[in-house]
Swiss-Prot record:
EC number: 7.1.1.2
Protein's UniProt keywords contain Transmembrane helix: yes
Membrane topology: Multi-pass membrane protein
Taxonomic lineage from the root: Eukaryota, Metazoa, Chordata, Craniata, Vertebrata
A GO MF label: ubiquinone binding
Catalytic reactions on record: a ubiquinone + NADH + 5 H(+)(in) = a ubiquinol + NAD(+) + 4 H(+)(out)
Name of protein: NADH-ubiquinone oxidoreductase chain 4
Family according to the record: Belongs to the complex I subunit 4 family.
Record's subunit section: Core subunit of respiratory chain NADH dehydrogenase (Complex I) which is composed of 45 different subunits.
Length: 459
């Protein structure tokens, strides 16, 4: 535990005391070393948890998400270099400090043993994210996006605090490792149903559930590249992780209360996928595709089967890497043509063939081409939902079809077609960008060879 937390905190002096010309290389190499040190977390020989102290532990559910969090920091630093090129050094260092603070909070959130501690850290991740969006976003609408982000997530989270205090008083402890030992079955009553709603709503907003998703496209579109990456790859997964932990405690109630949410997810999944087909803004399209993928994860968790938990974990990791890669590609387009409109970037394949290859790989992963882990996750979710109701297979099949359509639409619109007249003297693709894309795609390829390390505690 400490051999991850202490080097992460040591990134602060590395950032502030580094020579200005060496700041990027120092922080990137240091954070990459931390992510490689964290690989030991993925090894769970007996499927038990690693208990680091009374307050922190890791198990097969949190370990892949921890690894994803640590892997993302060097990638965010690499992706942000162009965005911060004209900023003064103090602001560059402040930006990096925000990213490091966010990483520290996220690592501690995924490792928290007590649910109250988990809640405090879960809320603490809002502050650096909000500062990143509202201070370093590209347009003035970033303030509006920050307000949406803050109020949606805070309003959803307040009932969770009340519910956790109530559970603490009735059970005596909220320690995740021992809670199953004295867990009493909750009575079937209105108060229990309200308790379930209060507990689950914070995570539904964070995921986000269709209907509570309005903050997500705004936050994604207005955030700088690192904000978009961490939001899509890790912060949405906090919702899924929390939902898995909390539904285990509220066990029998979930089975009766989940019906309206399952229907809303299955409906919203198709709606948001259809919205993607109508998008002209590249970042907005990727944001709506995140809502669609997360709806699948909510379905898998609420059905409450071991296969569902496996599918949800696999899909969360796969989506984290894929959507982060798509945001990086959208950002590299934006850096060259200074517009997020897809039609403005058409025909780029002739000028930047290697970038077009990355676009192809990212789009194919997004539409869950075999044998990617995206497909493994989607198949497990499909099997789970089919065991719950046969009709869901039609809806999920339709969603897969629309996902394939908008992924290919995005690829063809941005890469194929006739080159626009003002796109002739573009910068070539940089080694930094190619390294960034390969560091997204390599974990996806390696996980295809051995997916069991990310299939969670029920494998």
């Amino acid at each position: 535990m400490l051999k991850i937390i202490i080097p992460t905190i040591m990134l602060f002096p590395v950032t502030w005391y580094s020579n200005n010309s060496m700041i990027w290389i120092n922080t990137t190499s240091h954070s990459l070393m931390i992510s490689l040190m964290g690989l030991f977390l993925l090894n769970h020989p007996s499927n038990n948890s690693n208990n680091f102290s009374l307050n922190f532990f890791s198990d097969p559910l949190s370990s892949p998400l921890l690894m994803l969090t640590m892997w993302l920091l060097p990638l965010m630093i690499m992706a942000s270099q162009y965005h911060l090129a004209k900023e003064p050094w103090f602001r560059k260092k402040s930006y990096l400090s925000m990213l490091i603070t966010l990483q520290t909070f996220l690592i501690m959130t995924f490792m928290a043993t007590e649910l109250i501690l988990f809640y405090i850290l879960f809320e603490a991740t809002l502050i650096p994210t909000l500062i990143i969006i509202t201070r370093w976003g590209n347009q003035t609408e970033r303030l509006n996006a920050g307000m949406y982000f803050l109020f949606y997530t805070l309003t959803g989270s307040l009932p969770l605090l009340v519910a956790l205090i109530y559970l603490q008083n009735s059970m005596g402890s909220l320690n995740l490792l021992t809670i199953n030992l004295w867990l009493k079955e909750l009575p079937n009553s209105w108060s229990t149903n309200l308790l379930w709603m209060a507990c689950i709503m914070a995570f539904m907003v964070k995921m986000p559930l269709y209907g509570l998703h309005l903050w997500l496209p705004k936050a994604h579109v207005e955030a700088p590249i690192a904000g978009s990456m961490v939001l899509a790859a890790v912060l949405l997964k906090l919702g899924g992780y929390g939902m898995m932990r909390i539904t285990m405690i509220l066990d029998p109630t979930t089975k009766s209360m989940a019906y309206p949410f399952l229907m809303l997810c299955l409906w919203g999944m198709i709606m948001t996928s259809s919205i993607c087909l109508r998008q002209t803004d590249l970042k907005s399209l990727i944001a709506y595709s995140s809502v669609s993928h997360m709806a699948l994860v909510i379905v898998a968790i609420l059905v409450q089967t071991p296969l569902g938990f496996m599918g949800a974990t696999a899909l969360m990791i796969a989506h984290g890497l894929t959507s982060s890669m798509l945001f990086c590609l959208a950002n590299s387009n934006y850096e060259r043509i200074h517009s997020r409109t897809m039609l403005m970037a058409r025909g780029l394949q002739t000028l930047l063939p290697l970038t077009a290859t990355w676009w192809l790989l990212a789009s194919l992963n997004n539409l869950a081409l075999p044998p990617s882990i995206n497909l493994i996750g989607e198949l497990l979710v499909t099997i789970t939902s089919f065991s719950w109701s046969n009709i869901t297979v039609i809806l999920i099949g339709l969603n897969m079809l629309i996902t394939a359509l908008y992924s290919l639409y995005m690829l063809i619109t941005t890469q194929r077609g006739k080159l626009t007249y003002y796109l002739h003297n573009l910068n070539p693709s940089l080694t930094r960008e190619n390294t960034l894309m390969s560091m997204h795609i390599l974990p996806l390829l390696f996980l295809t060879l051995n997916p069991k390390i990310i299939l969670g505690p029920t494998f």
